[in-house]
Amino acid sequence: MSDLFKDFDSVSAKEWKQKIQADLKGADYNETLVWQSREGIHVKPFYHPDDFEEAFTPIPGQPTTWHIAQHIFIDDEAIANNLAIDAIERGAEAIVFEAENEFDIYKVFKKYPFEKAPIYFNLTFFSKDFITKLKQFFSEKKTTVFYNIDLIGNLTRSGNWFHNLKEDHKILENILSENSSEAIISVDTTGYQNGGATIVQQLAYALAHANEYLNHFDNVTLSAVEGSNSQQSLEITFKVAVGSNYFFEIAKIRALRKLYAALASEYKISETCHIIAMPSKRNKTLYDYNVNLLRTTTECMSAILGGADTICNLPYDALYHKSNEFGERISRNQLLVLKEESYFDTVSNAADGTYYIESLTDELAEKALELFKTIEKGGGFLQQLKEGKVQQKIKESAEKEQQLYNEGKLKLLGTNYHTNPEDRMKDDLDLYPFVKTKPRKTIIEPIIEKRLAEQTEQERLKQE
């Protein structure tokens, strides 16, 4: 292909800025066009190759394609089995199984197309015997399984360990020491995002969270897991919630891979991580609920362009309806449209080399690394959780964002902007859509997930 730009003189960043300033006719360039994000990043009106001193380097571990996942809660094994098989027949490429108790493995996976659809688990209990049963079952199958064991994630959500710190880690050591190449450990960062943390905080906490595992198991288990092929065996799965700040969220996932690669290299393990992404709950609403479709679509787009391995969409009515065929089908079809009709799977790493996103990736990574180092100097992530410092920082960020919403500066269409006074939801609530309080004794203060619109919605429901 011929060079279409060879007949045109190149324009430097300085020349662009001079032209913009002339067009502003006296208005201040910085005050008019440069804005500051919640993360403290000054976003410029344009980005240019002159902004970069070094050539772009590829983000480590980016996938060449991505998978459409369907979430299924296991209550009745036969129903879960039917839902999984039906979802795969209708376009799902992976299944995320959630369970609160042990289940009949053979019933859930009866006639399951193992080679066709990878399996992710989200188990809210921790049993060595049950994990062993699962591993034995899948050892005879040609499939990919992600067990997603996250002891610290459970601690941040519930305020307690499954058993206690020592016993939980001992069980995990035993599982890891079985010398398998399966994906065992996960780092669930969704609670940080849904709790109101900034993107920089999410990245720093994700890194510190992962570092607790790597540091604990460095001398105890990793050598046994890795054997002679140390750079290939261990891979951590990150669960990521994606918010509405489109370009920042693309950069967030890229920065996470970049940061993890740097951390993993220090432990001499594989620099590749696996990322499963899902839309945030924080900006979802009860009223004018169809807008949730628009929100989740752009959030899934951010996850795809950012380089997530798997996307598990959130149904538009997930806040107030129990899982239902219509909502699940629509959420799956959103991803199918992005993949099959919008061709979001035909170009790998589409964001690479885009000046704005590359700049955001670098700035977010730098700021997150600074915060990570501060956490480590303070005794590490677990110590900071124990002292309540992480929880306090997330609260402060959440309160600032809540204030922006309350003042109308952060707009949620149909809720605090262009509301429909005729909209009624009181009789349509199958689920309680607000923060649930469950008084109990905890060893740390749990991180509470809360939506921005909760107070507004509660007031509207009272008036119906």
What feature does the model see in each segment?
Residues 221-227:
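Positively charged N-terminal leader segments that act as targeting/secretion signals
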Residues 40, 91, 260, 306, ...:
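Conserved, mostly hydrophobic/aromatic
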Residues 183-210, 305-309, 314-347, 360-364, ...:
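Mobile "lid/hinge" segments at catalytic clefts and subdomain interfaces of large enzymes
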Residues 198-202, 245-255, 282-294, 321-331, ...:
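Short glycine/threonine-rich loop-to-helix capping motif typified by GTGT followed
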Residues 329, 333, 339-464:
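Catalytic-core signal marking the mid-to-C-terminal active-site face
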Residues 207-210, 239-331:
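Glycine-rich anion/phosphate-binding loop at the beta-strand->alpha-helix junction
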Residues 34-39, 152, 189-192, 235-243, ...:
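A glycine-rich phosphate-binding loop feature that marks nucleotide/adenosyl-phosphate handling sites
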Residues 1-220, 231-241, 245, 448-463:
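Catalytic alpha/beta active-site cores
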